[in-house]
């Protein structure tokens, strides 16, 4: 199984919540996708880094980041995946 397929399986198994869910808006939904359950997971987070590096392979960049809280674990996962590949990549928040 490649990283992308593994990540998809992790998302389906850990991030998708089925059943009645009350959203922060107060509205009701039949399902909810909580990707924090993936980006902060010991098995899934490395897959996030691998897949994000693969998806951005054609771009030139030296650092990754975004709005704090949501982007922090993604940037960190990419930093570690890059190091594993022998590439120096910084993260910022």
Where are these regions (language model features)?
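Conserved PRPP/pyrophosphate-binding segment of the phosphoribosyltransferase/PRPP-pathway fold
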Residues: 39, 43-93
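Active-site-facing substrate-recognition patch
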Residues: 1-59
């Amino acid at each position: 199984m490649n990283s992308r397929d593994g990540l998809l399986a992790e998302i389906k198994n850990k991030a998708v919540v089925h059943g009645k869910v009350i959203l922060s808006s107060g509205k009701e939904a039949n399902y909810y996708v909580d990707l924090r359950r993936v980006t902060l997971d010991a098995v899934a987070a490395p897959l996030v880094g691998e897949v994000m590096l693969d998806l951005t392979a054609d771009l030139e960049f030296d650092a990754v980041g975004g709005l704090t809280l949501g982007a922090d674990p993604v940037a960190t996962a990419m930093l570690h995946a890059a190091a594993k590949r022998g590439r120096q990549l910084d993260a910022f928040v």
